[in-house]
Amino acid sequence: MRLFTVSVLLPLISAALARHFTEPPPDALVVKPGSSVAGHFSSLGEAVNSLPADESSQVVFVYPGTYIGQVNVSRPGPVKIIGYTKNSFDFTQNTVTLVHNASLASGAGSDDLTGTLRVLSSNVSLFNLDIRNDFGVAVSNGQAIALSGQGDQMGVYACRLFSYQDTLYTNVGNHVFLKSYIEGAVDYIFGRHSIAYFEGNTIASKGSGCITASGRQLNDTGIYVFNNNKIIAANDAFPNVTGNVFLGRPWGDFARVVFKNTFIPAPLNKTIWSIWNPGDERIDSILFAEYNSLGSGVADAQRANFSTVLTRDQAAQYTLASILPNYRDWVDVDYLH
């Protein structure tokens, strides 16, 4: 009998578990540049705008390409937007890129209106999309959102989000971000009212600044929980990233952010967490907490006195099930493994 070593079996197991999106599901709308097939769309925006304004479930399948322009999802019924990929669990295999260029400095009018992809309705799921706001750096008013989440039960799976300031606006509703890549520098995961859960993601700092800016204004259920993520310096990070990255600062007086089981090779500031601004600290009623942070980025940490290191029992209170009890009704749980 032939024996297989673990090193041989693991790739076979991984291949067996891999899922691919290379053909449109039945009844899906299709986005495919240059296609002459009747009913195909040349842009994602056109496809989304053509969806019926009813409660039906709809799927949009996007073939490889770079698609320019803002996309707004606002219909009442559930929507899945699926990007072509040969491995749906690996964001490095993504082939679909959405690009927009807007910021407050360019006159967009609000944070949300700068977004490349604006999710304005509930029950929207995004798979294997690269979403970019290419505005870049500004001296002021540089808010330039890649993904704006304004609806309930938004799931983001193996997507990549790119900007510099305010990359991800997780603002209203219950949101999950699984096996994705989120890149930015200044307050690049932020919002006011959402409950947001992050697992299996790579979070990449491009320059100095804070990763999160929780804008929680009341003592309500809003929270960001990060579990089993990795924090790195982006491949093209600016030199000022070293020693100038923080896990978060409090945009709102009741900011609440928990990081659990985080691997951090990124060169964080030794205090790990930041006040909002000198003279406007906003730290009296916040929860900035960690459990089991590992890696060179926290090796010499001298944590701020307004932060909390959780015990094992305390950390166990912050799980996907505890903050989103009905998650199995809407989350694609395959991305939790």
Residue ranges: model-predicted function:
Residues 1-20:
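Fungal secretory targeting signals
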Residues 19-337:
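Sequence-level preference for short, compositionally simple segments enriched
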